[in-house]
Amino acid sequence: MVVKRSGVMVLPGMGAGDASTIAIRTALASQGYRVHRWNLGRNVPTPELQSALRSRFFDVAERYDEPVALVGWSLGGLYAHRLAEFAPNMVRSVITLGSPLNDGKQLPSLSVPTTSIYSRNDRVVSWARSLVDDRQPRHENVEVRSTHLTLGIDPSVMVVISDRLRRDPDRWKPFRTPPLMGA
């Protein structure tokens, strides 16, 4: 079942801002999604930024009668995970790109569909640190051939993001790599 195009908020990695996610946001907007940038300047982790992000998220989520999807690159993916922990009823799904989700100890599993897109060629975040516990319901790890700095412009990453966003969370199935995409 294909769901209607819903709201998506895209979060950049550490030290980056909205300019770094323009390719992702443009691709999703061209598919009919209502895409929201993070709108908080450069991602420099501070308590003030965490508070501002939570406010920004609530501002975006309250515009819709349904939960919004979160797409986070690197540290932005960790933020997306934390937002979904804090307000799961407002989050439709979480998609992370090369995000440091574990340091030997997994983050708590989310109640929403969670896809970690990772690459063994990342070179910034160890691919093993990007993995979610895929034994949990509606959690998966999808490997791509990319580097950390090109995850946001890699066509194979966009294939995964688009596929995951199209899925009805109640009819979730693991991503199936198209034959020509490879891993």
Which residues does each PLM region occupy?
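C-terminal catalytic-base region of ester-bond hydrolases, centering on the histidine
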Residues: 110-183
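Serine-dependent carboxylesterase/thioesterase catalytic core
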Residues: 4-19, 23, 27-119
